[in-house]
Amino acid sequence: MAKTTPNTTRSRSAVLKSPIDATPESGVQRTVLPGGLRVVTEFIPGVRSASVGVWVGVGSRDEQPSVAGAAHFLEHLLFKSTPSRTALDIAQVMDGVGGELNAFTSKEHTCFYAHVIDDDLPMAVDLVADVVLRGRCRTADVDVERQVVLEEIAMRDDDPEDLLGDAFLTALFGDHPVGRPIIGSVESIESMSRNQLHSFHVRRYTPQRMVLAVAGNVDHKQVVTLARRAFAGHLERGVKPAPRREGTLRLRTMPELSLTHRDSEQVHLALGVRAFGRHEGHRWALSVLNAAVGGGLSSRLFQEIREKRGLAYSVYSGVDTFADTGAFSVYAGCQPENLGEVATVIREVLANVATDGITDAEIARAKGSLRGGLVLALEDSGSRMNRIGRSELNYGNHRSVAQTLTTIDAVTSEEVLEVAQVLLTRPFAAAVVGPYKRVRDLPASVRGIVGK
């Protein structure tokens, strides 16, 4: 249930002959430049747009507790100025071509991106690279942007679903970096210094951790040339790309129950379990399970809780996936007097799925939903850029849409049942945001989720 946090601001290096790694099955072309910078492109016929993203394999889980929120703070700060551009210059050049410039931070990576017409591709590559590589951490800018981030935290605190998402992951993962909010805390942001942010930038933002992803009406060789120019002075010979993020998550703490008091008309509930890391091989079986359980209007949770009983307006399930772990969660927002029954029905639905799996008809609908969602989401260059940038950072390879659709179709009911039996019998965490001051004031069915 974690959400990425967008920024609110919308000479030539030594030549190394880098072979183009063309992958005709996926339509993605890939070149590795000196310094370990990876350049991946996808040509989309029939469009006049180009989307450019510089992906950095650094996110909030890479922070020490004393600088919690640094990756997101830095994402904001780098737009303030570079040696050759002021914040106004950056805004005006993008406004002048009708483009979009933005960024977001997640647990494991940060992306700075631009969306422009194809004629403005050279400007977009140069601008995004300038911000990422040469954005300055000036003390005055740090103090100004600190207030912006604190306002963003206040805005998060006023949005029950956003607040709940952060509280749930903390309840599930404890004080592990995956469990900490991407945005940080008031305490960490207020105490963070210019030197800490500058050090984070210099140490973490290196080409070997970066991917330049470009999609649209683009030519791969031209993009490589633009990359050499934009990253000149940073492409050091003999440096290879950083390996993909892997590892095994080890936690000593058990999932917990979190309660945040808010004088609200509704109560917001999230409950769920630790799930699989992205390299464990259960991605699509879990996706099918998620779609069937809480992914749409015909899902079990929606039908049982809203359509049959009218207990909640919004109810859905979701999956968060990280390199070495993940989360499967269910959200519901309801009147306080309905919370106990909502929690009971959710647990009954999940228990039935863990015992009996889902029907063939549910699997067919879930697969159709995944197929349609995947294809429809890739009809613009921004979505394509996101897909190839994430794939390069997370997996180091690229699959075509057709290959992915074939993989989805191959998921069996036995695989879905196995995933359900493994996940839904694990210890649950829960988070509640609403008009309750003490855990003991919560309905017994909610406290029972984590054995309270």
Q: Where is each model-derived feature located?
A:
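Flexible, small-/acidic-enriched active-site or ligand-binding loops
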Residues: 255-256
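Charge-rich, well-structured scaffold segments of protease-associated domains
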Residues: 2-15, 26, 32, 43, ...
